Amino acid sequence: TALMGDDFTNSGLFMFVADKAADLSAGNLYVAKISQTSAKGGPAAASDFSIKWIHLGHATSAEIEALANTVVPTDIMDVKYTDPNDTSYKKIGYDGANNWVKLAPNSKLPADKLTQAAAFLETHRYAALQGASMAFTKMEGTTVNIKDKIAYSAMSRIEKSMTTDEYDVKVAQLKSGAVYAHELKGGQVDNNGKAINSEWVSTRMYVPEGLAGEDIAKDALGNTSNIDKISCPDNLKFSEKMRTLFIGEDSGYHVNNYLWAYNVDTKKLARILSTPAGAESTGLHAVDEVNGYTYIMSNFQHPGDMTFVPAVETAVRPLINQNFKDGYSAAVGYLAFKA
């Protein structure tokens, strides 16, 4: 089972369930239908959703490769960017704008191949056409806590399509973002009442205690997110041995981006690494128990890539230019913990 979102406005939560374990060459694709159980317009930190799944289609890698090599977008979907005043089109949100869409009426593809191509090659628009909740903004990394059957998704910024009620989700804007947890269960069915062949299906999505950022007025250093909380979470990795979720930031709201460690038992959040000003904390990986150690791989890129307040610009820019080749170099490293 593969669970993922994508870095998009009006993105969905998608799930792929392979026909055979450890073989992703064939399977079923699903998209989430969200029901908000928390207060509409309430704080993102308290947001809570139940999830059902819409079946989009089944395919093999060979089938999709063959389609990709033979069709063009207009063979799949008829898309208008202004209202055609035609009820055969459905209005959808797509990357922050309105589209009016329907399956291509004069496609060269037979009906079964048309819907398959739409599901796997025009996934966003087809998911919206099928009634999915295309609400999410900036959904980034996903990881899993196997023991507790909890997955985690980074919502780098909570804004735009998540703050209206057009797409089944309405929470207060939180540019600092949050990490959402997914409760994973078996015994689920799709919108057609057909069993989903997985024990790892998300049925609930919520923000755990301590995993929401906080927007603030700009401080003296230029931070617009509280530096003692996460901001724009991006990379996520979970260490089963340490019972810890590691969170890397890609934020323009912290002058220095951080790598955080969140213990899922104590709910304690700790900052364990700071990158140079303007750099992104990325390349995150957790490797449990190698020769008695757990390793956290991490790197940073594009140091100095932000507009600093004057005092920081004067103090920091020369150091970035001197130490990181005018901002064009990066560094890769690791932290080691005794297992």
List each language-model region with its residue ranges.
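Sequence/structural signature of beta-propeller domains
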Residues: 1-339
